[in-house]
Each structure stands twice: as structure tokens, then as C-alpha cells.
Amino acid sequence: MTRKILVTSALPYANGSIHLGHMVEHIQTDVWVRFQKLRGNECHYCCADDTHGTPVMLAAQKQGIAPEDMIAKVREEHLADFTGFFIGYDNYYSTHSPENKQFSQDIYRALKANGKIESRVIEQLFDPEKQMFLPDRFVKGECPKCHAQDQYGDNCEVCGTTYSPTELINPYSAVSGAKPELRESEHFFFKLGECADFLKAWTSGNNPHDGKPHLQAEALNKMKEWLGEGEETTLSDWDISRDAPYFGFEIPDAPGKYFYVWLDAPVGYMASFKNLCDRIGVDFDEYFKAGSQTEMYHFIGKDILYFHALFWPAMLHFSGHRAPTGVYAHGFLTVDGQKMSKSRGTFITAKSYLEQGLNPEWMRYYIAAKLNSKIEDIDLNLQDFISRVNSDLVGKYVNIAARASGFIAKRFEGRLKDVADSALLAKLAAESDTIAEQYENREYARALRDIMALADAVNEYVDANKPWELAKQEGQDERLHEVCSELINAFTMLTAYLAPVLPQTAANAAKFLNLEAITWANTRETLGKHAINKYKHLMQRVEQKQVDDLIEANKQSIAAAAAPAAEESKYEKVAEQASFDDFMKIDMRVAKVLNCEAVEGSTKLLKFDLDFGFEQRIIFSGIAASYLNPAELNGRMVIAVANFAPRKMAKFGVSEGMILSAATADGKLKLLDVDAGAQPGDKVG
């Protein structure tokens, strides 16, 4: 039976260029969508620009244009970049749309009627010059822990500590430079804590389509930490409102109050799909009504799991809609082992890649060849990129057609021999279900390894049968025709297998093969006595100069990525040189982790219950991003500063020491290992 599927990628924010980090997700999604369509399923792929919020408003003001004009321009740029990489959206829309406004307000009203919205008076920092309340990231100051300057209002990028904006020393507005004031304001909260029972059931449940989990195992473990165990929950209610001035949608019956961008952003999935449905005549309600039998999948980055696996399903369910079938998260992209960061400009833009004339299918293949169903970071190693593309796509795949097509054209009038009984083709066809399952399960790396293994088998067949020698031998025309026909059929099968990853090459190959289009059926079927067209070269090799030119075009961002500690070093120089006596004041001890857990209300902190041998202590550490499953640290030995002055960690409690960790090249913090035999309380030094 034909499946009905809605698929989305996370919405790019309308405040900058698309970089290759974005492309990881959109390539991952596009490959899956193209596979579904090749299989004959009704699959709709929708996305949009995420256009609301203070950053967009301020960026437009800085440019001296209306926010509406700025986001329209950015959307055109984003769509051009994605289209250049053959991302085949059925609709690429904007969250600043009439559909999104209507859906956002309807969902809010439904949640309010369901008792899930509550108003509260809160205190916030206010910019007296700009007459606006300041989001955390628009307050800067001195870190209260390490005293690094110019740190954001929610966490320190030097030492990793999280805090509230009011804890900053000498805070100032990043908008005007003014000293902010603490003022009261009425805000609206989505009572997420009351949704815990539903969320515990949904996050740990399986979808009715095929019985697979709604979430990946790593994501489920993280949700369990946030949701708590048993009847208790650690979920905090969610502030869904912002004060004017703000670029977004005004909350019904609340003048001067606007929906926080993270409320209307996921609703943008609905809006984009509704816009598509109205254009092509699809029943929108069939996909979003409660109890819908259709499928809905969201492909996202691991950094926005909290919103998509908790807020979004709860918003949908308690407003009378269906919840997602699956939420699939991926890791981040690094370049030559270094972290990419949009906020710091350390990224290779999609536009620069295209402008340098590099084939986008090279990057599609390379990224797909590293993706699997787990939440793992992937690295773009530029030398490996060159060698893998040249070896796999040019050396193994397209050369098959190049080596056989000339003989078919010159010796057999462009017509193939019927080779339905070929053992080689039977071998390729036998892998159809396995490779289909790998695509379905997002195990692209495994699928492409298997496809390249088949390509190796075809090339071994070429070398064993040597069509160039058969062409020179008397009485071998029949055998030459047979061998070359097998090779063209094998090339067709490989093209069908690769079509989700290489859509443009597949389309060009279809023209050469004289086929209307490549479908998944081509992985099993032979072409018979089929006439083909003259072969045109399908793919060039990657040249070192092309990659060198790409690096040159992005040299400032690449240089920043290659020296991530440069900015931090200025803070290190502030400290005076330590003497031996100074060092001896630091009492470092071995401690055993009795229990480690996530901290409610913080995406940075982990809470450690530690046994120092002589006593037990609680220490908070800002390493949550490095350990998605904190429970795996239970029983581990760590090194901690035992005489570090206790420090109050905002609303989370008192930290009674400091755990030592190492900052890796990709920006993560990793706990230091303790050699076997060390016991809790042992002194380090």
C-alpha cells in the first residue's frame, strides 16, 4: 500500500548564510525523501525560513530596512543555496505567513482552553535606551566564575559555566551598551510540567506504522533525564511570550505581547504544508488530525531535541492534533577536525562551494557516506573528500558506463542484448531489499558501502572479461555484446541505488539510458533489447586546486576554525604567573561518581554526587553537551579540586568543588581519566 508521508527539515534562521553544517541535515532529509518517492510513496517535503525574533528585528534595523524586506531577501538566498545542492523541497515557505499566524493563534487558543496556558509576572533585564526587554544573549558582561569579559547572559564561552543574566558582573546591553535595569513584566507560560505523563508515553513509545521508536536511543535517554522517573517530573513550564518591540505574531487578547519564536517556528511546518496542500489539492487535515494514519517525520540537529521531542509533541497533542511519527536528530559537522560555528563565522558557505564550481553531488555523496541513524558528529576531511569521491564515484561507478557504452554504440547500433539470466545482475538485484532497508533506516553509510562493494564486483567482472580485448578478437562479437550489455544493465542498477544521493547524475544517466526516469524498480529489472543513447561524460574528478580555491575563498573562517583557542588566550593572559606555592594551594583529589544526572532548566550542566573517600559532595559541571547519557558516568573515577570555594549555581544549588576536564579540538569538554588503582580521596599532584 502506498504510504502517505510528510517530512520536514529544521527551519534555517533568517539571519545569515547557509553553510555546509546546514547541508548535513537537508542532504540527509532529501536523500530519505527521494528514496521514498523512488519507491512510489506519496511523500511531501516541506521547509521554510524561521523569520521571527529579536535578532531578525535588530538586523533589519541595522540595515535600515523593514524586517519583511530583509527576510524576503534572505529566503531567496537560502533557497538558491539549497536548490544548488539539489535539495528537492515540495515547498519552501516562511514562518512570517498568514497560515502560520492562524495556526499559531489557533494552537494557543486551544492550549488555553485546555488549561495549559498560565500568565505570571516575571523579572527581566530592560534596556532603558532602546526601551526593550533583553533576551539572555543580548546581555553581556563579566563571567561571575572565571571573570572573562564580554560573555553572554546565559553561559560563559571560556569556562562553560551557565548562569542567569542577573549574575553577570557589570552587565551591559549588547544592543545599546547601556546598563540594563531589572523590571517586571507579565508573561505567558505553556504548562509543560502537566504534559509529563503524555510525554513519557510518547517519547518511549513506538509509531503505529512500523513499530519503530519515535526517538533514537540516545535521544530517548536524554528525554528520560529531562522528564524524570516514575510519577515525578523535572520539566519546567515554558515561557512562550516576549514583550514589544518584537518581530513576530501578537498573542491574541494580549496587546504588546508576542509569541516567542520557538512557539511559531515548528508551527511553520504546518503552515508550509498547508500552503502546499492548497496549491496541489491535498487534504491537510488527513495529515494533522488526531489519530491520523499518515506519517510525519522531523529531521533536526541534536541541539534542538528539547523543542522537537518535548514542546512540539505536547503542543500538538494538547491542541487536538497528531504527534510526530518520528523525530530524527543528527550530529554536527566539523571541517578537518575543527568545530564549525555560525556565530563566530567559522563555516564554509554553501554559496562559496557552488561559486567555486564544485559539483554539489560530490558533497552530497561524501556527507551521505558518513551518515547513519545515530546522533554522531561527522567530519569533512578535505583530503578524504577528494580521494573518496574520485575513487568511488569516478573510478568505480561512472567508469562502468564509459567502458561499455562505446562498444554498444559502434558495434551494435546502440542496442543492448537481453541478459536477463546474468549471474552478475542477479547478484546486484539480490541486494535491493537490503539496501532499501538501509535507506529507510537512515543507514546511508552502510548502504553506500554495500553499493560500492557491488560496483567493485562489476569492475572485477570488467577486468576478468576485458571487453577491449574481446573487441579485437575474431568471432567474439556475441560475447562482447553480452558483456557490455551486462555492464550497462549493472550501471543502471547502480544508478538506481545511488539515485537518492545523486539525483542529477541519475537524471543525466536516464537520458543516456533512454529511460523516462530512474525508479527503484531498476534495481531489480534488466533492460532487455533496449536502445540506448550516445554516452556523455557524467562526472568529473575533484581536483586539488578546486579544494584549495574553496579554502582560499573561506580562508578567514577556516583560519578561525584552525585556531579556536586564539580568542580564549587573551583571557588566559589576564592571570598572573603562578608560583610553586600557588600551585600547592590547589588540593586535587580522586573522586568516584556515585550518581550523575542532567539539571532541570539547564542544557549545559550535569550534577555529580561524588565520593571523596573522606566525605560526599555535590559538584555541578558544564559538560552536558559531551555526555548525552550522564548515567554512563556512574562509577567512574574523576579528578576534582577539593578546596575550591563553594559556589551557588543560580537556582540549581551549591557546587562544592570543580571537576577537571580537557577541552578537545572540537570544543567539547572531556573528563580526565584516572589510572587504575587510584582510590577516592587520593591526592593528585
Swiss-Prot record:
The gene is metG. Belongs to the class-I aminoacyl-tRNA synthetase family. MetG type 1 subfamily. It is found in: Cytoplasm. Zn(2+) binds at residues 143, 146, 156, 159. One of its GO terms (molecular function) is ATP binding. Its main location: cytoplasm. Its cofactor is Zn(2+). Homodimer. It catalyses: tRNA(Met) + L-methionine + ATP = L-methionyl-tRNA(Met) + AMP + diphosphate. A motif ('KMSKS' region) lies at residues 339-343. It comes from the Bacteria. The keyword DNA-binding does not apply. PANTHER family: METHIONINE--TRNA LIGASE (PTHR45765), METHIONINE--TRNA LIGASE, CYTOPLASMIC (PTHR45765:SF1). Residues 582-685 form the tRNA-binding domain. One of its GO terms (cellular component) is cytosol. ATP binds at residue 342. A motif ('HIGH' region) lies at residues 12-22. CDD domains: Anticodon_Ia_Met, MetRS_core, tRNA_bind_EcMetRS_like. Keywords: Aminoacyl-tRNA synthetase, ATP-binding, Cytoplasm, Ligase, Metal-binding, Nucleotide-binding, Protein biosynthesis, RNA-binding, tRNA-binding, Zinc. One of its GO terms (biological process) is methionyl-tRNA aminoacylation. Is required not only for elongation of protein synthesis but also for the initiation of all mRNA translation through initiator tRNA(fMet) aminoacylation. Binds 1 zinc ion per subunit. InterPro entries: aa-tRNA-synth_I_CS (IPR001412), Anticodon_Met (IPR041872), Met-tRNA-synth_bsu_C (IPR004495), Met-tRNA_ligase_1 (IPR023458), Met-tRNA_synth (IPR014758), Methionyl/Leucyl_tRNA_Synth (IPR015413), MetRS_core (IPR033911), MetRS_Zn (IPR029038). This is Methionine--tRNA ligase. Its EC number is 6.1.1.10.
